[in-house]
Curated annotation (Swiss-Prot):
The lineage of its organism: Bacteria, Pseudomonadati, Pseudomonadota, Alphaproteobacteria, Rhodobacterales. Belongs to the RRF family. This is Ribosome-recycling factor. SUPFAM superfamilies: Ribosome recycling factor, RRF. It comes from Ruegeria sp. (strain TM1040). Coiled coil: none annotated. Responsible for the release of ribosomes from messenger RNA at the termination of protein biosynthesis. May increase the efficiency of translation by recycling ribosomes from one round of translation to another. NCBIfam families: frr. One of its GO terms (molecular function) is ribosomal large subunit binding. GO terms for cellular component: cytosol. Keywords: Cytoplasm, Protein biosynthesis. Pfam families: RRF.
Length: 187
């Protein structure tokens, strides 16, 4: 009989939380009908010879629910920031006002809303797969310990622990998806 098996559930939880954090980041980048500074996070500007995030070349503000402004610090970069936004695929048309770039956020049409809910669903599915992969790793550790002499009762206990953690995280993903889809479909 081997020594007492102790599954590192904290590690499994940390890895599952990482999948949730990644999902939230992906959800934040989805454009809903509301303005958000986080929608510009994936946009990179060719500044000073390297690709730089927009928030490092200017101040990003949300003065109104449907407006994002970027106060570019270096006047020479205004054109590059504008170009980066146009080419980003966000579907936003920047308007220049000196060193301030205004981004009016247009209303989403029904078709685009449906597309975005599908994209959100794909992001959620990726998160579920990541969580299930962590579950599989935990179950593999348990099976290995069983082969090394763990009792069947201990095996069942740890399998239940891992499954409960997985179920809890999958429910959190589903809840986050439901919230995001409602936010996207809100007119």
């Amino acid at each position: 009989m081997s020594e007492e098996f102790e599954l590192d559930t904290d590690d499994l939880k940390r890895r599952m939380d990482g999948a949730m954090a990644n999902l939230k980041t992906e959800f934040a980048s989805l454009r809903t009908g509301r303005a958000s500074a986080s929608m510009l996070e994936p946009v990179m500007v060719d500044a000073y010879g390297s690709m730089t995030p927009i928030n490092q070349v200017g101040t990003v503000n949300v003065p109104e629910p449907r407006m994002v402004t970027i106060n570019v610090w270096d006047k020479g970069l205004v054109g590059k920031v504008e170009k980066a936004i146009r080419e980003s695929g966000l579907g936003i048309n920047p308007q220049l006002n000196g060193t301030i770039i205004m981004l009016p956020i247009p209303e989403l049409n029904e078709e685009r809303r449906r597309e975005l809910t599908k994209v959100a669903g794909q992001y959620a599915e990726h998160a579920r797969v990541s969580i299930r992969n962590v579950r599989r790793d935990g179950m593999d550790q348990i099976k290995k310990a069983k082969a090394d002499g763990m009792s069947e009762d201990d095996q069942k206990f740890w399998e239940t622990e891992v499954q409960e953690l997985t179920d809890k995280m999958i429910k959190a993903v589903d809840a986050a998806l439901e919230t995001k889809q409602a936010e996207i479909m809100q007119v």
